[in-house]
Amino acid sequence: MKKSLIALTLAALPVAAMADVTLYGTIKAGVETSRSVFHQNGQVTEVTTATGIVDLGSKIGFKGQEDLGNGLKAIWQVEQKASIAGTDSGWGNRQSFIGLKGGFGKLRVGRLNSVLKDTGDINPWDSKSDYLGVNKIAEPEARLISVRYDSPEFAGLSGSVQYALNDNAGRHNSESYHAGFNYKNGGFFVQYGGAYKRHHQVQEGLNIEKYQIHRLVSGYDNDALYASVAVQQQDAKLTDASNSHNSQTEVAATLAYRFGNVTPRVSYAHGFKGLVDDADIGNEYDQVVVGAEYDFSKRTSALVSAGWLQEGKGENKFVATAGGVGLRHKF
């Protein structure tokens, strides 16, 4: 009897040790089709079509915490892409970190969402195509190898600061400073995210000496209704003496409402004409995405969406349309 009890106790020890470790993820895939048309001097110069089975951002992760006493906890997470097409490799290529959490807030180091990315609910679409999500305004969002502090919430208000070191260089990982705040009151919310970067290499031969971005999002979110409006301003000073100052303002809005198991949704984004040394350039754009989700259960949903994007106006423009259907399962 004693031997059986001891064996049972020993067998339970690994389970107890693993109790604070959570396996989670999302598998989502579908079929997308698109058609894009280039116009130059009023004439169609190129037409491109594409249809394919695509992964819509599948992921798998492990996270956990350990109670260190006196209200202090060690927290960690390892998350990676998990494409059903088998095109992803490596560990920790999504948000992955280790840190401490307590009454002071949360301090983490690793590959972390930028403060700007955490205001990204303005773009709620599951898509591979840039035409099926408001991805142009979302393009500056990134995950950075960085250190980040998030404050506790006081009367609905919380804040975050983040720093990415210069030696973690890359397209999105030049030396950068990030800050933001969140305010919640009932279903209403206001979010701000901003960043300042130095010596930012966008691509080969295009270097930015100073870059800053600011985004303000406001809206309402409860169990059924989601509505938000975002304004974003980017400003960059290039290292090249010619055309050294560039800026653009963008706006976006999203509206969704849940009817039983169905949630229809619509998003609109607009990019105003950018400036190069205070002169207008024709990089304005308009984008519309409409779609819906049908929940078979709390974990499994069907997705359908259609999108339209136009860059430029008049005789010189680019117009794209797209459609997609998919299936998503969370675990």
From Swiss-Prot:
The biological processes this protein is annotated with in GO are:
monoatomic ion transmembrane transport
Can the keyword Magnesium be found in this entry's annotation? no
GO cellular component terms given for this protein: cell outer membrane; pore complex
Write down the superkingdom of origin.
Answer: Bacteria
Stored CDD domains: gram_neg_porins
- SUPFAM superfamilies under this entry? Porins (SSF56935)
Is the Chloroplast keyword given for this protein? no
What molecular function does GO assign, one term?
porin activity
Also noted in the record is: Present in outer membrane vesicle formulations which are used as vaccines in human.
Q: How does it assemble?
A: Homotrimer.
Q: What is this protein called?
A: Major outer membrane protein P.IB
Q: Which organism is it from?
A: Neisseria meningitidis serogroup B (strain ATCC BAA-335 / MC58)
